[in-house]
A protein has these predicted regions:
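Residue-level signal for threonine
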Residues: 56-57, 200
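Active-site-adjacent substrate-recognition loops and nearby beta-strands
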Residues: 42-55
Length: 220
């Protein structure tokens, strides 16, 4: 709460401006990274800058249905296309990436408030603030929620809409849910071991006393 209330950062009035015009100069960006000139080509290999490699899944497209962000986050690259591409990163700022934004702090506050067992109204306030800055004006659905698990899932969905294709925070939040919720989003994850990474083999060579490998993996 302190960084939200007393920090030098401000939520961007028009969210798309962060990614398409202002970049790291936006007052919302708390930590951002710009590749050096000799790193741009390598960076472009992995970024979602209108590349045909990155297409919106039906699930993500459905998530943005009737959402103001759909207009600028998804689009057809040509009249012949039938599958929507990710257009969040277009314009002059495609090489800049965002590790931490103030929006994330609001969403973390909302999640922490719910998980701490506090009043749901206190959790809805930062959530609705983020939604409002994204252009949403109807909060009827959020206001009607009385179940903690339901509100947590709405916070997760808003985290995906806001922070997808940035620093992977939406994946971190998903892993904080019970397995049945994770499977709802990622059916391919058939067991808990799928979300646990192995300890690199080199670590066992450097430190023989490190102990056992993580469940589901061998040391070799």
């Amino acid at each position: 709460s302190d960084i939200i209330e007393n920090g030098p950062y401000e939520l961007e009035e028009h969210v798309r401006d962060i990614f398409q015009t202002k970049g790291l100069t936006s007052k919302e960006v708390m930590l951002g990274i710009q590749p050096l000139p000799n790193q741009v080509t390598r960076y472009d290999t992995y970024i979602y800058n209108n590349s045909a490699q990155y297409k919106a899944t039906p699930m993500f497209k459905n998530l943005l249905k009737d959402d103001p962000r759909e207009e600028w986050m998804l689009g057809l690259l040509s009249p012949k296309d039938t599958i929507y591409a990710i257009t969040k990163y277009v314009g002059e700022k495609i090489e800049e990436c965002y590790a931490i934004r103030l929006t994330e702090m609001y969403l973390l506050k909302a999640e922490a408030t719910v998980r701490a067992g506090k009043d749901l109204g206190d959790a809805k306030e930062p959530l609705k603030t983020v939604m409002g800055h994204a252009g949403i004006t109807d909060f009827t659905k959020i206001d009607a929620i009385t179940d903690r698990d339901e509100l947590l899932y709405e916070i997760y969905k808003e985290t995906v809409k806001n922070l997808m294709f940035e620093d992977g925070i939406e994946w971190s939040m998903l892993l904080r849910f019970p397995m049945e919720v994770i499977l709802k989003v990622k059916p391919a994850i058939r067991e808990k071991n799928y979300i646990i990474l192995p300890i690199p083999a080199a670590e066992f060579e450097k430190n023989p006393t490190i102990g056992d490998q993580n469940p589901g993996y061998s040391k070799i």
